[in-house]
Amino acid sequence: MSTDNLFEDIEQDNNPSFYGNPSILNDPYRPIQPPPPQQQQQQHQENESKQSHTKSPKPPLQSIHSGTSNAHPQSQPQHKHKHKHNTSLNNGYPNELVNSTIGLSNRILELLNDSQLQVDIINSEKLVNSSVIVYTIELSSPTTKIVVKRRYSEFKSLRDNLLKLFPTLIIPPIPEKHSILSYLLNTINHSHEISIIEMRKRYFKMFLDDLIFQSDYKLKNCPLLHKFFDPNYELCWYNALNEPPVSLIPDNLLLANPINPADQNGLYSLLPIVNGFDFNSHIDNLSNLKKINEDLYKLNDQVKLYELKGFEQDLEFSIPEELIQFEIKFHQTIKILTDLNKLNSKTTKNYKSMVDTLIDLGGNLNNFSLQVYQQKSGSNNELSEAIEKFGSTMDQSFLNFESFILNQLVPQWQEPVDQLILYLQNSLGLIKFYKYKIVQFKILYKLKFNKFQQLINLTNIGGVSSSGSGGGGLLASRISTDNDSNNSNNSGNNNNDGDLDTENFDHLKELNSPTINNALKNLSTKKISKKSSWYGLFGGNNQTKKFNFQLPIEEPTTATGSTEQQSQQQSAPNSPQREQQQQQSQSQSHHSHQTSIRFKLNHIEKELNKLNQLIELCNQDMHKLTEALVNTFEEFLSKIERKWLQLMITYIQNCKNMFEANLTNWKEFKESLVNETREVN
């Protein structure tokens, strides 16, 4: 056997350039300048010489790709344009490859929408000099067939990215990845490794069937799914994960549009991040929806009482009772199916034990029939024949049970039940995402209340300073989270315990700010005292430190000569002009102080406006997300009920067929035994 072209064939089979010009991977949009005609002729001769020395057939994937290129109605016979085809590849023009890829993508889309489509995992193989297993997927219809190979990690990355692209849909599950310990055990026990590979093939088939035939149409039309079935992306799946729409999704899904995560609205990047959120984990450390809904009712009441802008009815948000019941039902169903899964494992173990018993019993009966035949030799040895038939009937029974376990019990009952559990866990994952969005929504209100607290503190400072009572130290001590408030602190006493006088705030009306005017109105009507605290609404005096929202600050240009004047006044001797200088210095300091307060109030006004936009955006998203999840769960439960009914009917039918086959065997054995007894008599 010649091995001259062996490595060349392997290189051709594993080289991305096999699917076209490799320049498309570097720069798919800018063609390379064609080489001179002499170089073209030389390259053409080299290609012909290589083809003449090649004895091995072309890889299977070439037939798939060439089939896609011939699918165009305007394509001509290949022998007429062979030279032109090679020239286009050598020139570096990826036009033919692009056209072929577009044509194949259109074929995949048409194939997925074909009513006669069949999806199957036809093969699994291990890569050369590697422990990686690849699974061969076949999409076939009466007119089209596409074959592509995928690894387990590529199945998992497809599903993980579909979860991010469609956070309101339930994506079909795939089997969990094995731990390192189980991987080591599988390498030792080869038969167990084979059973795991076969199990994964069945799970992947169920995954693709549910994804294409029983899921939302959005999943079937997703470009990422089309690339998963595209042989051109077989060796460059990483490129598909770095292209739109996957590349448009932010790293943290809480900073994206929950309905369309690929939305590029810049406001989502300003949303607060909730610690502990892991979208790919099934662990949920938050309270149930019923408890969270009670907290939302409290939040709505607090907003009605303390919202300075005035509470609007469309901003009121609560969790519908349907969604709360869905969560309860999912947990209950998971518990029931988990118990059923444990019972199925015990049942399968008992069936296998019975098969082993029947094997031993059948073998012993056959040996016993031989011993009887040897002890009583003759032409009419009815006892030996009866024992042999008894053993054969035992063998038929064990074969029926073994076939039932391998072909019906495990793949058509036990594994689908386990898949239902994974489905329900995925639905709880959507509810967990919904909970974290609610927490994010509540944090926005906490941030807004903290800004209100800063607004009132600055208003108090402006009012007391303008009255000249020297109480700035008291009010400055109440601004626990405003880092810039220390610039406006003056030495004073902390003995001002009286109520605030709203007449001292008239100078703030010049700002013409709706929020500040509403704040002044509430101050005059509710008589908010200095002990009122916004962060007391949610417990703890450090909430403003934990939840903070700040926009970039542009410091105003103000006169800063007050400190120099004070130092000069301290060093100057006593004179009649000292009192006049002190009065002038105080007036300048008061003016600078008022300017600083106005600037801070304007800055807080901007932050409040931005928070109002975020709250309105998040509120709209929560209403849409709630409606989408309710619709998804209603459809999901109806599908689960149909799937469960089909599983039960199939399981009962398989059990009935097995027991009928065993009963038929034993009836035949009984009839043969009765007939032989009659003949003897």
Curated annotation (Swiss-Prot):
Lineage: Eukaryota, Fungi, Dikarya, Ascomycota, Saccharomycotina
InterPro entries tied to this protein: PX_dom, PX_dom_sf, PX_Snx41/Atg20, Sorting_Nexin_Autophagy
Protein's name in the database: Sorting nexin-41
CDD domains per the UniProt record, alphabetical: PX_SNX41_42 (cd06867)
Ranges annotated as biased composition (Low complexity): 482-497, 558-589
Record: residues binding a 1,2-diacyl-sn-glycero-3-phospho-(1D-myo-inositol-3-phosphate): R151, S153, K177, R200
Domain notes: The PX domain binds phosphatidylinositol 3-phosphate which is necessary for peripheral membrane localization to the perivacuolar punctate structures.
The keyword Ribosomal protein appears for this protein: no
The UniProt record lists the keyword Membrane: yes
One GO CC annotation: endosome membrane
Native source organism of the sequence: Candida albicans (strain SC5314 / ATCC MYA-2876) (Yeast)
Subcellular location: Endosome membrane; Endomembrane system
All copies of domain PX, residue ranges: 113-236
Comp. bias regions, Acidic residues: 1-12
Family label: Belongs to the sorting nexin family.
Composition-biased stretches (Polar residues): 13-24
Function: May be required for cytoplasm to vacuole transport (Cvt) and pexophagy.
UniProt cross-references to SMART domains, sorted A to Z: PX
MF terms in GO: phosphatidylinositol-3-phosphate binding
GO annotation, biological process: autophagy of mitochondrion; protein transport; reticulophagy; retrograde transport, endosome to Golgi
Stretches for region Disordered: 1-94, 475-505, 558-597
Membrane topology recorded in Swiss-Prot or TrEMBL: Peripheral membrane protein
